[in-house]
């Protein structure tokens, strides 16, 4: 059911039909399938179906309870930004931590950022570096960039204050 929904949502090998994909994802989510819930949340968050971030967040919360790393990561992102509900850095960090413990590359990168800045919990540079290294080893480009910035902490900005490059010793 979820697989067909993905094909319909993306138009991969079949005519694109987001409305039918949504129905399939809804049935899967209602049956307790975490992938159905995360895919439905992606559509509800604005990925082609009517945008409903409150519903997306509720669906992700339900899927996150099944220990779905992807749902925990997506819910963490929404919680960190206050999309579909209140912003809560402590709760977001907890969600990222749960997904990172399962090896989710995006969650590992976010844990690195949260640990580096002290957002939602204690600041810990060595933990941040460890999270970034794990995420980078899994191919996360943001983590690779964060590690590079740590090696080259001096920044060049243009006249508008936009990042141009890092300087290294």
Residues of each region from the PLM?
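Canonical positions in the second alpha-helix
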Residues: 27-28, 62-63, 98-99, 134-135
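Short helix-capping/linker turns of helical repeat alpha-solenoids
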Residues: 10-12, 31-34, 46-47, 65-68, ...
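Terminal, low-structured helical/coil segments at or just beyond the last alpha-helical repeat
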Residues: 134-169
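A charged, solvent-exposed segment within the mature domains of Sec-exported extracytoplasmic proteins
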Residues: 54, 61-62, 66-77, 90-91, ...
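Hydrophobic face of amphipathic alpha-helices that form TPR/SEL1-like repeat modules
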Residues: 1-10, 37-46, 72-81, 85, ...
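Structural signature of tandem alpha-helical TPR/SEL1-like repeats
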Residues: 15-27, 48-59, 86-95, 122-131, ...
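Recognition helices and adjacent regulatory flanks at domain boundaries
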Residues: 33, 58, 130, 137-138
């Amino acid at each position: 059911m979820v697989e067909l929904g993905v094909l319909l949502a993306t138009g991969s090998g079949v005519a694109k039909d987001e409305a039918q994909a949504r129905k399939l994802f809804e049935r899967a989510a209602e049956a307790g399938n975490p992938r159905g819930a995360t895919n439905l949340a992606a559509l509800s968050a604005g990925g082609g179906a009517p945008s409903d971030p409150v519903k997306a967040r509720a669906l992700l919360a339900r899927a996150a309870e099944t220990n779905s790393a992807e749902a925990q990561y997506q819910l963490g992102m929404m919680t960190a930004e206050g999309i579909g509900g209140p912003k809560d850095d402590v709760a977001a960090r907890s969600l990222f931590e749960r997904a990172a413990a399962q090896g989710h590359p995006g969650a590992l990168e976010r844990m690195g950022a949260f640990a580096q800045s002290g957002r939602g919990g204690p600041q810990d540079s060595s933990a941040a570096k460890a999270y970034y290294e794990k995420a980078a080893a899994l191919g996360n480009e943001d983590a690779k960039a964060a590690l590079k910035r740590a090696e080259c902490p001096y920044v060049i900005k243009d006249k508008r204050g936009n990042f141009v490059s890092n300087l290294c010793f």
